[in-house]
Swiss-Prot record:
GO biological-process terms attached to the record: chitin biosynthetic process; glucose 6-phosphate metabolic process; glucose metabolic process; glycolytic process; intracellular glucose homeostasis; mannose metabolic process; UDP-N-acetylglucosamine biosynthetic process
Catalytic residue list: 196
Presence of keyword Transferase: yes
Location of region: Hexokinase large subdomain: 195-413
Impact reported for residue 196 to E: Severely diminishes the enzyme activity
Role, per record: N-acetylglucosamine (GlcNAc) kinase that transfers a phosphate onto GlcNAc to generate GlcNAc-6-phosphate, which can be a precursor for glycan synthesis. Can utilize a broad range of NTPs, namely ATP, CTP, GTP, ITP, and UTP, as phosphoryl donors. Shows only low glucose phosphorylation activity. NGK1 may play a role under a certain condition as an alternative supply pathway GlcNAc-6-P as a precursor of UDP-GlcNAc.
PROSITE patterns cross-referenced by the UniProt entry: HEXOKINASE_2
Source taxonomy: Eukaryota, Fungi, Dikarya, Ascomycota, Saccharomycotina
EC number per UniProt: 2.7.1.59
Name listed for the protein in its UniProt record: N-acetylglucosamine kinase
Hexokinase small subdomain, as annotated region: 51-194
Taxonomic source organism: Saccharomyces cerevisiae (strain ATCC 204508 / S288c) (Baker's yeast)
């Protein structure tokens, strides 16, 4: 037996879970239900799901904007057909987040819509073009919709305090249109600002048949799903009521289900056995499931293993990210490592992904049980995230470890589509005028 085969067997015993997936599913289910009843940072109700919705065929356009980082995306979307009529994107070169930050963004959007015929000049039309606007905002917001923090190189200013993202964007539209009314003859009604997890869930709900779960596995790990409204503890029902539009009679709610932003990255503290190479600071203990499944932390565990066993030098120049791990798992052409170690490195990458897939399969099955959808005998999951999307091995291992048939459907453009769907559904319920 070679040294490398001995090392591979040692790592296999350290990495792959010793417990059965049945036991892990049971423990995850208990933790999900406990967090639903008691936790204030996970298993959070985001919006109510009406039992019946009247369909509409809007003449007004839905403009969706995706604030996801340094590249801003926007689109004109028609529903209920889910047609992206026009989409565009541009880099955000201004990183000071103040009123001028939003003004510049809105001016660029209006300019490009006008150039493509969606906004007319005042002398070209007798009636202003009307748009409903929905926004996906991927940075943390407080319950009032105010910005809590912004990373990725953005610098917040005090001018944001006391204003919601919805108010800031609506104010910028008003300013830009009023100052350029001859060029931008239109009205913009900002309807919704939602986070990316909810956007994925709404897209999944709208596109996938019999779906119960939407999944995000990119640099982070999260899931959204519906549970019966009666599952909510009183303090979460009260908090949800405060977020509802004034058009709701908050005392006579007639809903059976509520959409949950689960923040599943926090799950597994007493279930997932982290190894020394999995420790990347306090975050590993706070978010164990995200630590072992996401495209941000799993690659760093691989790097730590290779350093620990002197397979790579400390000054190794290659960045360990999700893309690299996906290529290693698929045994792509070696362009980074010494050939004598390459087969072992690929094997270690696959072991880490197998562990990730085991826990993803377990959490998905636990969610499936508490949503009450287990009688379908399969789980239809709409998902996003480049880490999962780019790894066929990861997706196949999730299916391998699951005792229920899993269908994974990638939801392209979900941040844009989900925002439009939020406005579409709520306009059907007469929340949007």
């Amino acid at each position: 037996m070679t040294i490398e085969s001995t090392l591979a067997r040692e790592l296999e015993s350290l990495i792959l879970p010793a417990d059965s997936i049945v036991n892990v599913v049971d423990q995850f289910q208990e933790e999900l239900l406990s967090r639903l009843q008691t936790n204030t940072i996970s298993m959070l109700p985001q919006c109510l799901v009406p039992d019946k919705r009247s369909r509409w065929n809007p003449e007004d356009k839905i403009l969706t904007i995706d604030f996801g980082g340094t590249r801003l995306k926007f689109a004109i979307i028609s529903l209920p057909q889910i047609v992206i009529e026009y989409n565009d994107a541009f880099e955000l070169t201004y990183n000071i987040v103040d009123s001028n930050f939003f003004n510049q963004i809105i001016y660029t959007i209006c300019t490009r819509l006008a150039a493509n015929g969606y906004i007319k000049k005042k002398n070209e039309s007798s009636e202003a073009s009307k748009f409903f606007v929905s926004v996906t905002f991927s940075f943390p917001l407080n319950p009032e919709g105010e910005v809590v923090a912004m990373g990725k190189g953005f610098v917040m200013t005090d001018t944001l305090q006391g204003s919601t993202v919805k108010q800031l964007i609506q104010s910028s539209f008003h300013r830009i249109i009023s100052e350029n009314i001859e060029e931008f003859f239109c009205t913009m009604n900002v309807c919704h600002v939602i986070n990316d997890a909810i956007a994925v869930s709404l897209t999944s709900k709208f596109i996938c048949e019999n779906d119960s779960i939407s999944l995000i596995i990119g640099t982070g790990t999260n899931a959204c799903f519906e549970v019966p409204y009666g599952y909510l503890p009183p303090f979460k029902r009260d908090a949800l009521r405060e977020t509802l539009p004034s058009s709701y009679n908050k005392e006579t709610l007639n809903f059976k289900h509520v959409l949950i932003n689960s923040e599943i990255g926090f799950i597994g503290k007493n279930v997932i056995a982290l190894q020394p190479f999995d420790i990347h600071g306090a975050i590993s203990y706070e978010m164990p499931l995200e630590c072992v499944t996401s495209g941000k932390w799993l690659p760093l565990s691989l790097k730590n293993i290779l350093l620990q066993y002197n397979i790579i030098p400390k000054n190794f120049p290659v960045e360990f990210n999700g893309e690299l791990v996906c290529q290693l798992a698929e045994d792509c052409t070696n362009a980074w490592f010494e050939n004598e170690h390459y087969a072992l490195i690929c094997q270690i990458a696959r072991l880490l992904i197998k562990r990730a897939a085991f826990y993803v399969a377990a959490i998905v099955q636990a969610i499936d049980i508490i949503t009450g959808c287990k009688n379908y005998n399969f789980i239809h999951i709409g998902y996003v995230g480049s880490f999962l999307h780019n790894s066929n091995f990861y997706r196949e291992q999730i299916k391998y470890y699951s005792s229920i048939h899993i269908k994974l459907q990638f939801l392209n453009h979900s941040n844009l589509l989900g925002a439009a769907i939020a406005t579409y559904l709520n306009k059907s319920d007469n929340q949007v005028q």
